[in-house]
Amino acid sequence: MDTMANSILGQEITFLKLDTRVIKNFDKVLTNNIEVVETSLWSVVRKNALKKGAAKALQACASSVLHKRSDYEFLTTGNVLRKKIRLPRLFGNKVISAAYSWIKRVQAALLLDYLKEHLSQYDWDQLIVVVFNGSNYPESVLAEASKGFKRVFVEDGFFPGTLQIDPVGINAANSVPRCSAFYKSGRDFSEGGLPTAVTNRSSKRKFTPVDLAPGFVFVPFQVPSDMQVTLHSPWVKDMYNFYDIVVNAAEQNPEEMFVIKEHPRFKRSVIGSRPPHPRVKFANGNITSELISNARTVVTINSTVGIEALLLGKQVITLGDSCYNIQDLVLRGNDMGRLNAALALRGWLPDDELRRQFLGFLWNYYLVKGSFTEPPTALASRILDCFELDSEVRGAIANLNN
């Protein structure tokens, strides 16, 4: 196992991750400091045989094949749901869906058995586990196996060229403080400046821009198979459901025009699946930043578009769980009654000091500058920094509560 003499902690540390393609470039900057676990079925079976011997490896295989469904289903639910959303005709077939689910559970059982035994060789202070997202197999298995070890979860950041690296979780499950008092406790988090760039998602190619009068309600749709929807959206279950909610809101708020932009990464469209509404328009060909700029409010489940809207000082209404669900920063609309009540607050704007402090904390302290294709060269130090930040934040919040 490759190790490093870490100059910050003064002890040897190994970073362990899976061979997930998205974070492959982490290997280059961590070089000899990292152990990469191969996750192919053959590789896991082979390693189990080398570690346990052929007889025990066969026993593990038999156990995985004859597993109790409830023991591993939670590790593969995201994979099955994603297939059903992306390929509804194929995976809507109960036989195909059940077969795929069983295969994934067998893989999860074998990988979990291997990882638990492999990780048991490490002392707690020798290892940092790097989990990409953690919501789907195989990363969900690593997240389960690494409980009790120091670990970080990684995901895209909220602004271009940034990453989330967090010891607690990512997106709505991350460690970003939800306490508005934290951001007003005296420290100027925005002193280092605020981000200036937002992510302009490429438009769906078959649509052209539409002319819109300013002052509309902008509703950015999200990828329904993404964890932001499947795990962190108790009310809105998919984009068809979201469209129905928007139409309902339009009926109950006759003075409002609602403008939807579908996420370009999701290739299926809601258009044509529901009757049109005269005050609900699609703007799939328009530029996201311009839609935010011209909107009077942004209604989102929990998209990063909400954070981008805060950067422009816009009113934001969230329907799902998010790390920016902070009192006086956004309005909550997690059911129809609350959504209508929030839409009625036409003059409401986020507390400007809180807004700047929150964005400054994200930009100057929380987010790591870099990307999956070009991770920071000092990635090891950035990972270690996130533990320090988490400890500091917890201490500050504890002091506020005393």
Curated annotation (Swiss-Prot):
One of its GO terms (biological process) is polysaccharide biosynthetic process. InterPro entries: Capsule_polysaccharide_synth. Keywords: Nitrogen fixation, Plasmid. The keyword Membrane does not apply. The keyword rRNA processing does not apply. This is Protein FixF. It comes from Sinorhizobium fredii (strain NBRC 101917 / NGR234).
